[in-house]
Design a protein with these regions (language model features):
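C-terminal charged capping/lid subdomain of soluble metabolic enzymes
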Residues: 10-96
């Protein structure tokens, strides 16, 4: 989600990086910090590490996610296709 929204959140991420006193205050520095934190807490890099792709039902989940009221808080307007792409990237571990 971070990398999907990068072009609209990059300046906000710089402010967060400043607050966190990260050495590298760029978007990439913040992303590296998040990925390192995820590794520290043993959070898998790919959703496919915890769920079988055939069980995911991407179409159904994408529709449900788009209908969720919290989706309106995303910095970018999302389409059903955007949701599907994010789920596919979550499964593969591809960061866009």
């Amino acid at each position: 989600v971070l990398t999907f929204n990068r072009d609209v959140i990059e300046s906000k991420v710089a402010k967060i990086s400043e607050y966190l006193e990260l050495k590298d205050k760029s978007f990439d520095g913040f992303l590296k910090w998040i990925l390192d934190l995820r590794e520290k807490f043993d959070i898998p890099h790919k959703l496919s590490s915890v769920i079988d792709e055939k069980d995911l039902q991407i179409d159904r989940l994408s529709k449900m996610a788009l209908e969720d009221p919290s989706t309106n808080g995303n910095p970018k307007k999302l389409s059903i296709e955007d949701m599907k792409i994010m789920y596919q990237h979550s499964m593969s571990g591809n960061l866009f």
